[in-house]
Amino acid sequence: ILIGLVGSEMCIRDRYKSECHHGTAYTKMMADYSGIHSEVRYYVPLNKTYEVWNLSVTNNSDKARSLNITGYAEFTNNSNYEQDQVNLQYSQYITKTVFVENRVRQMIHANLDRIEDGKEIDNKDVVNRFIGLAGAPVDSWCGDRGEFLGEYHRYGNPVGVESGKLNNHGNYNENSCGAITTVLELAPGETKTIAFLVGMIDNETAGKIVASYTDTKAVCDKELEELIAYWHGQLSHFQINTPSDEFNTMINTWNAYNCFMTFIWSRAASFTYCGLRNGYGYRDTVQDIQGVIHLAPEMAVEKIRFMLSAQVDNGGGLPLVKFTHNPGHEDTPDDASYVQETGHPAYRADDALWLFPTVYKYVSETGNVAFIDEVIPFANKDEGTVYEHLKRAIDFSMNHLGKHGMPAGLYADWNDCLRLGADGESTFVALQFYYAMTILKEFAAYKKDDEYITYLDESQEKLGKVIQELCWNEDRFIRGFTGDGQVIGKRDDPEANMWLNPQSWAVISGFASDEQADKALEMVYERLNTEYGAILMDPPYHAHAFDGALAVIYNAGTKENAGIFSQSQGWIILAEALKGHGDRAFKYFIENAPAAQNDRAEIRRLEPYCYGQFTEGKASPNFGRSHVHWLTGTASTVMVGCVEGILGMRPDFYGLHIAPSIPKAWDGFEIEKDFRGCHLHIVVKNPDHVESGCKSLLVNGQAVEGDYIPKELLSEQTEIELTM
């Protein structure tokens, strides 16, 4: 939105002041210039599919003012990124804009406006976008980007705004836009409110939308109240008060909100992914679910069902789940058609293994153990209970073992830059597999499936012996084996001799002995930790990468090549917390927490309220610079690491463990938690300033042994006091 003073020069920078405030699902920008104060609130109304730009302008001067207000939206010429940005010989000749009443209407494939409703030509029909104005009359408009900007002009000085009037022309071919100008007359001290509405919807509906904002201020205020109430309601199910403001703001608001964004969008919509990704990544989406289970289990279970329906009947996950996913009728990576359509040529070793902790966390949070008997179709054919789906995932790993008896790395094993194939083996996946069997034994015990428990016991023991004999290397776990048997990540390798994830997952899985856990975690701290978090491995690949070590394509200290891959920070937080190392767990949190980096924003560069995919590591000259914001698995792994690890909220099928692992400097903390229809007020006291451990536990004044609270002891309003 551009504000011009009629008959005056464009904005002079040193007289202009502005602020930008971000809230849950809205952004507010404020500016002051030449006695004019403006505030614009950007948001999408609850359960709507268009955007509102709600502008209030106040004349703080002592004279009447006449202001040109221009709202501008630059439309793409096609909803597909490649068609819009690359195939210009097509996309620049299918659009036009026209003015209708109080809005600029863009039409893609406008020449198809005479075909019958419901009919398409070459799978194409007219697509409509609009920008409309409510609360004031339209003075002038423009629908052509080139004419709006003007020759030799830029977005800071578009010719239409400089001249005070747009040219009332639409575009026909080339580049569309929607620009609308209105003139506001303001007496001294007067405020006026208008709204620009932007969306992709048919013309008739667009007209009704704009008309519904006639009482602009009242409608927008009400919508924002509803939006804020919705999000605060979602976040209110788990709130904390600790001695750390950074920890509080991330867990209570911004990490939680980030988790909802990744849960909703997966990796499908951002300026980084470019809107080109044509589905949900299996591992990404299943992990994202974990971040919202403690806040919105009813939302989480719907996505769990969806992802279970994207599991192939052989137990593997579809690497990419199409937006048009049709359970029971999908092609798989075994079919050439799937590979051609999605670009994913093979299964990944880890995809289905993420189901185990995710399903377990949902059932434990809700107590809905009966969920494992729910019947859900497989992606390609047949159906089975959730329990059967999990058993098939075990079968998939069992049927894809390498020559040592560990899971094969296949096309990738979480690390997309490790191609181990059908013969190479992954320690990371082996530890995931070990953990999956531990979880499934709990479900099998509930099912009284003794025969299967015996099978899992024997299989887990066999796998454990292999990991112990082949993967422990004095003070660390190796990363795995190449297809020809070469060890990845052994102590004397010249490059990549220390890896983060096998160490954290050796602890998370419950495999590592106390001695191994302490040694491995200490090596992580000594070798991998930095002031911005732990790097993924060290030293970076450069001259000694094996054929499947694709990380070597990246510059040293970048992404998988010894960058600080932020998703892994959540796992090292959890691992340290599970071992009772509260100081270390919190240190890893604070090193990578967005809210703790405002004093070095010029280095980090990302927003101070959301996580990024990675931070450049110590081998980079830009050490500390972060990238790929919002849509990252970091949101969920850090949330789990903090809630289950540092705060110690660890439910199981029948109750709740409270086992905090906190900085010893903390005197204590409080939690407000909704849990299975009960509201828990939890007070943790730390008079002896220890990092972990439970000295006493009171539930509604009743002493309870240990740190475990059976569900039967909980009431509608439950008071819990734990002394460390």
Question: Can you annotate each of these PLM segments?
Answer:
Residues 270-279, 320-347, 379-385, 404-426, ...:
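Carbohydrate-binding/catalytic loop surfaces
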Residues 280-285, 289-300, 304-404, 426-434, ...:
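Aromatic-rich carbohydrate-recognition surfaces in CAZymes
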Residues 29, 44-159, 163, 207-237:
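Polysaccharide-binding surfaces and accessory modules of carbohydrate-active proteins
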Residues 65, 184-202, 433-436:
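Short Pro-Gly-centered flexible turn/kink motifs
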Residues 1-7, 12:
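Single conserved hydrophobic/aromatic residue that forms the stacking wall/gate
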Residues 72, 86-87, 318-319, 434-551, ...:
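Catalytic cores of carbohydrate-active enzymes
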Residues 225-276, 302, 306, 396, ...:
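Low-complexity, Ser/Thr/Pro/Gly-enriched N-terminal "stalk/linker" regions
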Residues 616, 621-666:
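Catalytic cores of secreted or luminal carbohydrate-active enzymes
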